[in-house]
């Protein structure tokens, strides 16, 4: 077997069903091995390396399972690096297989095709686990090691590189078996009991959830019910608690409740807004639940740190929390939500379009946001009913991530509709992947809100820089004809009612992408509801 065949056999043994990729001479033996694997693993080729990497990211976010992409070295790796950074920031299990120049030439500066100075060093700054496959018998063990690292502690991406001549080297064939997952760390019963006592004695508890809570939705719901604690989610935590639950809240009301809270239980979240914007003081006890032992003390030492998988920790907390059944806070929170909705009414243009999307998207459909005015508002206003159905780019918040990421989600979850929202600026970062969607018959709906500008940048220039507008106005194609030229379905919607009708038609497509262009003007700023000042203590 060749090194590449060992690698593909290892991917299959570990349940990898798809490799998102863009081929090139450095990886020719790898693609030959993928061909020989037949239907056991599918190769989805894209039109740009960032498309392959973002598709793997979208598939990982939508399924919670590890995904793989393959690219050539040097420019191929660097073209995919924005997606790799985003995967790191979102703790997404994405494995990159990256080619290399001939092994004997690595680090010698000969000027080989796609040579890059210290590629391994660059990779090591982007991910926590990386390695080079140096001979055939290393391929399967290193893939197993990488996948194990990606799932241990804080999840995240990994990179394996392999020289072009090593991919084709051979060794005696042998069977490949999946490696056992890393054992879960034992629960710290003393710390859990301490946390349970604090929660049981609390008068105004608040739960904040991030992406690390997505697989503990039932446990979050039960603990929230027992404590009558509101659950705040922003971006990746959306959907952990169904938005229809009166205890489910978003950022603006969360800040008010942060000011009142005596105990905050933070589950799988960096707690960035609380520590850096809203402030802390001696009266606030913070309990951190995180898979990463370094995370709880990154900003400040918590009252209690619970390290491990959120699911068993929260289940145990719910069992141990003392005290009598608490009075319902549903009526109180519903009233406060209504007051907050009145304040958020200034975002009516965005809200109208988001309501149209929510009305047509099934409960289990997937919504992929973008760094655009509709996307910012969606993080505050869009109802989300289940984990992994609201995909948002985390702290990288990188423009242009959305369409290709949604394409990966749509490929991995062909059983549900997927809608990508984009601005005219961000969409053109990866709009060439319409060709990928058509070629592979992926039914994705993208809604392009066209205001003829990098709208957020333009508003900042108008409001904060004396209307000195520069480099923010855009000249765009006819998006409908542009999409149709790829073979996609396309139409234009001018208001929320027309958008609903267009979405209804789009979601009936099961083997073709659809683009819906929505011409819009400038929209009201959401930032007063996102970057909110301190409400207690010190930041």
Which residues does each PLM region occupy?
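N-terminal alpha/beta PP-like core and its mobile active-site loop of ThDP/TPP-dependent enzymes
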Residues: 1-321, 360-363, 436, 443-446, ...
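Thiamine diphosphate
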Residues: 105-114, 226, 255-258, 296-299, ...
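Alpha-helix N-cap/helix-start capping motif
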Residues: 24, 50, 269, 311, ...
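Acidic-residue sensor for enzyme active/binding pockets
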Residues: 49, 161, 370, 433, ...
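Phosphate/pyrophosphate-binding active-site segments
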Residues: 137, 173-175, 202, 283-371, ...
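Active-site-proximal loop/turn and secondary-structure-junction residues that shape catalytic pockets
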Residues: 164-166, 373, 520
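Active-site diphosphate/adenylate-binding microenvironment
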Residues: 3-8, 12-14, 22-25, 30-35, ...
């Amino acid at each position: 077997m060749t090194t590449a065949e060992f690698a593909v056999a290892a991917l299959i043994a570990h349940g990898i069903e798809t490799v998102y990729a863009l081929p090139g001479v450095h990886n020719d033996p790898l693609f030959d091995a993928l061909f020989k694997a037949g239907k056991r693993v599918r190769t989805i080729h894209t039109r740009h390396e960032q498309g392959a990497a973002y598709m793997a990211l979208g598939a990982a976010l939508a399924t919670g399972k590890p995904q793989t992409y393959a690219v050539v070295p040097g420019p191929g790796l660097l073209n995919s690096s924005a997606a790799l950074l985003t995967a790191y920031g979102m703790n997404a299990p994405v494995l990159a297989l990256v080619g290399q120049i001939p092994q004997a030439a690595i680090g010698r500066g000969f000027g080989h095709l796609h040579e890059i100075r210290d590629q391994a060093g660059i990779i090591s700054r982007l991910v926590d686990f990386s390695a080079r496959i140096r001979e055939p018998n290393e391929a399967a063990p290193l893939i197993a090691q990488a996948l194990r690292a990606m799932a241990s502690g804080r999840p995240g991406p990994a990179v394996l590189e392999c020289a072009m001549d090593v991919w084709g080297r051979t060794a005696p064939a042998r069977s490949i078996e999946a490696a056992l997952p890393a054992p879960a760390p034992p629960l710290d019963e003393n710390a859990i009991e301490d946390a349970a006592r604090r929660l049981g004695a609390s008068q105004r508890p608040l739960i904040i959830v991030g992406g690390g809570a997505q697989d503990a939705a039932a446990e979050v719901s039960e603990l929230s019910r027992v404590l009558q604690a509101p659950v705040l989610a922003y971006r990746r935590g959306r959907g952990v608690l169904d938005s229809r639950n009166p205890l489910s809240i978003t950022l603006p009301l969360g800040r008010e409740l942060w000011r009142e809270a005596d105990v905050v239980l933070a589950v799988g979240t960096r707690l960035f807004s609380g520590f850096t914007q809203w402030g802390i003081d001696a009266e606030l006890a913070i309990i951190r639940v995180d898979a990463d032992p370094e995370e709880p003390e990154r900003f400040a030492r918590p009252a209690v740190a619970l390290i491990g998988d959120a699911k068993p920790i929260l289940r145990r907390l719910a069992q141990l929390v003392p005290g009598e059944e608490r009075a319902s806070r549903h009526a109180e929170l519903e009233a406060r939500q209504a007051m907050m909705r009145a304040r958020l009414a200034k975002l009516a243009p965005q809200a109208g379009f988001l309501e149209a999307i929510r009305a047509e998207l099934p409960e289990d459909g997937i919504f992929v946001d973008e760094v655009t005015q509709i996307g910012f508002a969606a993080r505050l206003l869009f109802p989300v009913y289940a984990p992994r159905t609201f995909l948002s780019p985390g702290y990288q918040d990188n423009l242009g991530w959305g369409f290709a990421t949604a394409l990966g989600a749509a490929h991995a979850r062909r059983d549900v509709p997927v809608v990508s929202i984009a601005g005219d600026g961000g969409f053109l970062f990866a709009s060439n992947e319409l060709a990928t969607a058509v070629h592979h018959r992926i039914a994705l709906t993208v809604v392009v809100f066209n205001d003829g500008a990098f709208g957020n940048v333009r508003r900042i220039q108008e409001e904060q820089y004396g209307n000195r507008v520069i480099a923010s106005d855009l000249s765009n194609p006819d998006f409908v004809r542009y999409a149709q030229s790829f073979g996609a379905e396309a139409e234009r919607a001018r208001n929320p009612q027309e958008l609903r009708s267009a979405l209804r038609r789009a979601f009936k497509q099961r083997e073709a992408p659809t683009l819906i262009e929505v011409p819009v003007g400038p929209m009201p700023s959401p930032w007063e509801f996102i970057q909110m000042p301190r409400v207690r203590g010190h930041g």
